[in-house]
Amino acid sequence: VKTGFLLDVNVLIAMAWPAHSAHEKVQEWLSRHAREGWATCPLTQTAFVRIISNPAFSPNALAPGDAATLLQANVGHPSHRFWADELSFNQVLEVLAPRLAGHQQVTDCYLLGLAIHKKGKLATMDRAIPSLLPEKSRERDFVELV
C-alpha cells in the first residue's frame, strides 16, 4: 500500500514560500498529487524552520517562531501525514551505503530510506537523488522528481 509522498525540504519550502522560484511548479505538482497524501518528518520540519528563519535565505526571512507558525499552517492540510523518524541512520545505510558518495547526500539518503520504509515516494527537485540507487533498481520508483 502506497502511503504518499515525503516532501524533501526544498519542495516543502517551495510549497509554502510564494516568492520561491519553484513555488508555482510545486503548487501545480501538489494539485495533481495531494489526494495521494504528502508527508513531512522531524528532519524536514526542523530544516524548514531553520532555513526559512535564516536571513541568508531571504531578506524577508521569518523569525523562528513565525516560521514554525507557517509550517503548522501548511501541515494542517487534510492531505498531510506526519512520518516519525522510525529508522536509525545505520538501518538506512544497510540499503543505501554503497552509493553514498559525499556529505551533501547524507540527509537525502535518510529521507529516501524513510520513504522506502514507508512504501511512499520521496518528492524532490534534486535530480541527483536517484543516483543513490542502482541504475536499474526498482527502488528508483520511490523517487518522484517534481
For each predicted feature, which ranges?
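A generic structural signal for short hydrophobic patches within well-formed alpha-helices
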Residues: 12, 45-48, 129-130
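Acidic, PIN/NYN-like endoribonuclease modules and their adjacent C-terminal/linker elements
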Residues: 88-101, 109-146
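Amphipathic coiled-coil/heptad-repeat helices and related helical stalk/stem segments
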Residues: 26, 107-108
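Short, well-structured N-terminal submotif of metal-dependent ribonuclease cores
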Residues: 1-40, 52-69, 137
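Acidic catalytic patch
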Residues: 18, 39-46, 68-100
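A generic structural signal for residues located within well-ordered alpha-helices
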Residues: 7, 106-107
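A generic structural signal for well-ordered alpha-helical segments
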Residues: 33, 74-75, 115
